[in-house]
Structure formats: C-alpha cells, structure tokens
UniProtKB/Swiss-Prot annotation:
Biological role: Trans-acting protein required for termination of DNA replication. Binds to DNA replication terminator sequences (terA to terF) to prevent the passage of replication forks. The termination efficiency will be affected by the affinity of this protein for the terminator sequence.
Organism: Salmonella typhi
Chief location of this protein within or outside the cell: cytoplasm
Family of this protein: Belongs to the Tus family.
Protein name, entry field: DNA replication terminus site-binding protein
Annotated localization: Cytoplasm
Lineage, highest ranks first: Bacteria, Pseudomonadati, Pseudomonadota, Gammaproteobacteria, Enterobacterales
Amino acid sequence: MSRYDLVERLNGTFRQIEQHLAALSDNLQQHSLLIASVFSLPQVTKEAEHAPLDTIEVTQHLGKEAEALALRHYRHLFIQQQSENRSSKAAVRLPGVLCYQVDNATQLDLENQVQRINQLKTTFEQMVTVESGLPSAARFEWVHRHLPGLITLNAYRTLTLINNPATIRFGWANKHIIKNLSRDEVLSQLKKSLASPRSVPPWTREQWQFKLEREYQDIAALPQQAKLKIKRPVKVQPIARIWYKGQQKQVQHACPSPIIALINTDNGAGVPDIGGLENYDADNIQHRFKPQAQPLRLIIPRLHLYVAD
C-alpha cells in the first residue's frame, strides 16, 4: 500500500472516530441517567510535565455536571481544545462513571456502538505504530503533519463499558514497567549505541561516548547468567474496582476516562453503590498486599536497569 493510501485511510478512520463519538454522546443523552460521578484532577502545566506527582487533589462532580464533563472528555482529541498552559505531553485523565438505564434492545445498541468506536481506535493506532513503518521518534511529526494538534493518546484510548455492576470503588495504582533481560541482550543494545556516536545534552559527543563505554564495561564484568531487570516507574494511575454480585467476582480497570455502566432494568438490575476517590498522597500509601521484593542493585540509572543480587 502506498504512503498516500495510508494517509487517506488514517484521515478517514479518524473522521469516523469523531463521528461515532458524537453519535454516542447524543445516544447516551437520550437515556435516563441514573447516577454519575467523575473526579477532575489538577491541570498539569508545561513546566511541571516531567515532575513526579507526590500529591493529587481530587474534585468530585455529580449528576448532569459530571455527565457533561465526561461526554466532553471522550471527544477531547486536540490540544486546541485545552488551555495553552496545559501540558500536551501529560495525559488528561477524568476517572469516574456514568450509569444509564437500559433495556435489552438499547443495551445491545450501546454495546455495539462502543465496540465500533474501540475497533476504530485500535485500527487508527495500528496505522500509526505499525503500518507507517516509522520509528517512534518520527511518528509524532508524521501524524501531526496530517492531523495538527492531535493528542494521540486520547485518540488511541478506548472506552470502557460494563453491565450491571453491584459496586464501583475508585483508587490509585503505582506501577512499574518491568522487563527482564540477559547480560548479552544489554551488551548488544549498548554496542549499537556505541556504534552511532552522538551528543546527548548536557554531555558532548565525546562525554556521552565515554559514559556508554563505562556502562558497557560494567555490564561486561557481570557473570553471563546475571539476571538484569528494567524497572521503570509509571506515574500513578486512577483505577476502578468493579464488583459483580451475580458472578461473585471483582474486576479491576484502569480508569483514565469515565466508565460507561449500563443498568438493565429488564433483568432486574439496580443502581450500583459508587464510592469516592481519595486525594493521592505518595507519603501515605497503604498497601493491601505487598510481596517481598527481590533484592536489586541499580547499575545503569538512566535505563532504570537493575541487577539481582
């Protein structure tokens, strides 16, 4: 497929996403809103976009106000839709839930509508990340040449739809991206970097090359069977824990956007019990269960690379 054809499909798919999101917004507003609760988080400014989040103050919104914020959030796809001071790199998150009354027919209709939107979003992401054939650094410029100001994360982010929950509780999750590597795999990566000398501010090309050589020597000095692990922290994320009474099970969802909960009164479902979201405080985290961590020693800080002792 030619690059021109791919761009045509990219634009066409994105237009469909916009159209289907608008139709979903209209459709939801035709249904009876049983309960709605969303939690707005502080705006992240451009100056603070890389700063760690030690505290997050939450503001709750209820009812029709919550619904309006949620429907606008689903369609927030461009930086032109937000304040000039707001970071375009930090994810815009609005945890919460909208609960609508449905019957068997309208439930199926909304399920199909959300499924179609999520399929389009997945297709759009596949075009950008795979079909374009571009490295990650070049994708940004390519996408924004054709869709100026697009917030790609918001375009990729799928909607979460659930049916007949009994309770919904919100909280925070601290996670790490973890990847296990062998010594030889790390050496191979460092060798590629050494073969392509460059400067990385604040280091000159020569200083960076020297730094890479030291890192290579440190890894080469380890036993070949050494267990290496990248453990990169991810900024704290809002989550939702959903309890289904009939199935007697709990399901946890990431909750960057309001969940759409369909309450089927034809089947006797009732309004769920919805909890709040506490302010986040990194110094006051209570772990429900924290397994004993494997002893790790940091060996290359810039890569968050550890070796198991």
